From Swiss-Prot:
Quaternary structure (record): Octamer or nonamer in membranes. Monomer in the soluble state.
Annotated signal sequence range: 1-23
Protein's recorded name: Echotoxin-2
Region entry N-terminal region, spans: 49-67
Region of interest (Plays an important role in the hemolytic activity), residue spans: 23-32
Other noteworthy facts: Is devoid of the RGD motif, but contains two Cys residues.
Chain residues in the propeptide: 249-275
């Protein structure tokens, strides 16, 4: 149910954010805007592949003897691979499972736990987004004591050209205590009474994040493009089945372009191996 709601949010965002003036993208959006949102959401959900890490992270957190755990689940709706994950736990907590690359149209998770004693677990995790040379960054804080502290979440991106994380707690300190700067832009939310999602957006990408307000914390983040043509290929394929003639043609052209690009990449890699 929650994932259906999320898909509806994504569909509405794509339709509202894309400009009709865009030739190919505008043609697709004009077609999709006439289709019931529930139909679009169902199609988009079937395009997502759930990685094995989702079940293993949930199981690890559930079976853990530690009173504070945190599972972070990431959905990648873009055409880019989310790669080179870096988890930086800013206190003495530890990993229960490891963060993985997230393929286009894929869901992956990992889990963490608190250290011994009256401690929670907090830090950042980030991935390089394809060839954009920048990182998607998530900050979380799952405290031990709810009398004085709350769960907190921030989502954002590093600037283009900044693809290497700072030291262990630098990004956490900025995203928990501070504000966006020249290196990282983000939004932050407190999860004590409210569990409403937060939204980060720039000219190319949007990240939606949400967190619960219990000690078995769970973070969900969805990375999605502003432009329809930056959606993952499997999502575009699902949309192709729903689009009108002009929309189908635009999607088919984009998918063909990507297929040719991938063929050229493989050919180049083979040539390099044979040298």
């Amino acid at each position: 149910m929650k994932r259906n709601i999320l898909a509806l949010v994504v569909v509405v965002a794509l339709i509202s954010q894309s400009r009709p003036a865009e030739s190919a993208g505008g043609t697709i959006i004009a077609t999709l805007s006439k289709i019931p949102l529930s139909t679009l959401a169902s199609a988009l959900n079937t395009a997502l592949e759930t990685g094995a890490s989702v079940a293993s992270a949930a199981a690890a957190a559930t079976s853990s003897d530690y009173s504070v755990t945190c599972v972070i689940e990431v959905e990648n709706w873009t055409k880019h691979l989310m790669k080179y994950p870096v988890v930086q736990i800013a206190n003495s907590g530890g990993l229960l499972t490891v963060a993985k690359n997230v393929l286009p149209a894929e869901i992956q998770s990992f889990a963490m736990r608190k250290a011994w004693g009256a401690n929670g677990v907090y830090g950042t995790v980030s991935w390089v987004l394809g060839q954009t040379n920048r990182r998607v960054v998530i900050m979380w804080s799952a405290p031990y004591n709810f009398d004085f502290y709350s769960n907190w979440l921030a989502v954002g991106m590093s600037r283009p050209g900044l693809a290497v994380p700072s030291s262990r707690s630098t990004w956490f300190d900025l995203m928990y205590y501070g504000n966006s700067n020249a290196d990282i832009s983000f939004v932050r939310g407190e999860y004590y009474h409210s569990v409403d999602p937060i939204y980060f957006k720039n000219s190319e990408w949007e990240i939606e994040g949400s967190m619960n307000n219990i000690h078995k914390a769970r973070v969900r983040a969805t990375v999605k493009p502003i432009k329809t043509m930056d959606l993952a290929s499997s999502i575009l394929t699902k949309l192709e089945a729903l689009a009108g003639a002009n929309g189908k043609r635009a999607i088919q052209q984009e998918l063909a372009r990507r297929a040719e690009e991938e063929k050229q990449r493989k050919r180049k890699a083979l040539d390099e191996m044979l040298k």
